From Swiss-Prot:
Transmembrane segments: none annotated. DNA binds at residues 292, 311, 316. Keywords: ATP-binding, Cytoplasm, DNA damage, DNA recombination, DNA repair, DNA-binding, Hydrolase, Nucleotide-binding. One of its GO terms (molecular function) is four-way junction helicase activity. It comes from Staphylococcus epidermidis (strain ATCC 35984 / DSM 28319 / BCRC 17069 / CCUG 31568 / BM 3577 / RP62A). Homohexamer. Forms an RuvA(8)-RuvB(12)-Holliday junction (HJ) complex. HJ DNA is sandwiched between 2 RuvA tetramers; dsDNA enters through RuvA and exits via RuvB. An RuvB hexamer assembles on each DNA strand where it exits the tetramer. Each RuvB hexamer is contacted by two RuvA subunits (via domain III) on 2 adjacent RuvB subunits; this complex drives branch migration. In the full resolvosome a probable DNA-RuvA(4)-RuvB(12)-RuvC(2) complex forms which resolves the HJ. This is Holliday junction branch migration complex subunit RuvB. Belongs to the RuvB family. The gene is ruvB.
């Protein structure tokens, strides 16, 4: 699968920009107002009790700020943070080494926590509940269990697939926070702030236009802004103007709904080749040269969310809105 401008997943080239833009306090964090309000209360209460914050589960689509929030939690609690990914914890000993190195109150952030192996997950249960580890040393008749006491800590788990977590793991989190897609006003504010960090000016129309095409995702908004800035600098403009923005987005093949060439390819396939459906996912995959799982997990969720595609027992079907949008877009291209 090729990288897309509107891909919500992390790209390597996003690293420097995301790090430079990452807020360190809740008051600097744009959007997710309900989550911020709740965290302010939970953090203040924990500090008043001089206790670690309850374990926190952050879930929602990629690119919405779960990693950023985990760092903010550590900063607000005035403790250190250790960051790891679920797949990197292959053995119970890997987890034990990390947990035993934490200081009282520290935050352990596990990204992609739904990908923890079952053996590691079972070791994590008593660590989360009672702050101890039971480790088996040796094999066979010589095997024995060693209990390791741990300092109280806060586990922050992040996942894009909360439904994939086992019940016992999910229930051990005291705080569950779902990150929602951002509205246009919040994205516009994020884009304006990013432009300042990048050292460029952007007019209000351009910031709003980018916000509209960013799929409610700050990561995509910042990525699009960087590319539009390229056009501005080559044109030697003193700021990013709306004309340059629209021209750049047209060349990048990102339309007014944030749909790109792959979205158009898939929807045109359903509408033109299969009369709007219903058509099976395997048939679509063969027709557009993509894997079934990629279509199901990456491409179609946004199309369904925006009302262009629906799932039926007989397959995928284009909606009336899809006919209106894609036929109009195709006519403009012709």
């Amino acid at each position: 699968m090729d990288k897309r401008m509107v891909d919500q997943e992390f790209h390597n080239e996003d690293t420097d920009l995301e790090l430079s833009l990452r807020p360190t306090q809740l008051k600097q964090y744009i959007g997710q107002s309900s989550i911020k309000s709740n965290l302010e209360v939970f953090i203040k209460a924990a500090k008043l009790r001089q206790e670690p914050l309850d374990h926190v589960l952050l879930f929602g689509p990629p690119g919405l700020g779960k990693t950023t929030l985990s760092n903010i939690i550590a900063n607000e609690m005035e403790v250190n943070i250790r960051t790891i990914s679920g797949p990197s914890l292959e053995r119970p000993g890997d987890l034990a080494a990390i947990l035993s190195g934490l200081q009282p109150g520290d935050v352990l952030f596990i990204d992609e926590i739904h990908r923890l192996s079952s053996v590691v997950e079972e070791v994590l249960y008593p660590a989360m509940e009672d702050f101890f580890l039971d480790i088996i040393i040796g094999k066979g008749d010589e095997a024995r269990s060693i209990r390791i006491d741990l300092p109280p800590f806060t586990l922050v788990g992040a996942t894009t697939r909360a439904g994939s977590l086992t019940g016992p793991l999910r229930d051990r989190f005291g705080v569950h926070l779902r990150l929602e897609y951002y509205n246009e006003n919040d994205l516009k504010e994020i884009i304006t702030r990013t432009a300042e960090v990048l050292g460029t000016d952007i007019d209000k129309e351009s910031a709003l236009e980018l916000a509209r095409r960013s799929r409610g995702t700050p990561r995509i908004a910042n990525r699009l802004l960087k590319r539009v800035r390229d056009f501005q600098q080559v044109n030697e403009d003193d700021q990013i103007y709306i004309e340059t923005t629209k021209r750049a987005l047209q060349l990048l093949q990102v339309d007014q709904h944030g749909l790109d060439y792959i979205d158009h390819k898939m929807m045109n396939c359903i509408i033109n080749q299969y009369n709007g459906g219903p058509v099976g996912l395997d048939t679509i995959a063969v027709s557009i040269g993509e894997e079934r799982v990629t279509i199901e997990d990456v491409y179609e969720p946004f199309l369904i969310q925006r009302g262009f595609l629906e799932r039926t027992p007989r397959g995928r079907k284009a909606t009336a809105l899809a006919y209106e949008h894609f036929n109009t877009t195709n006519e403009k291209r012709e």
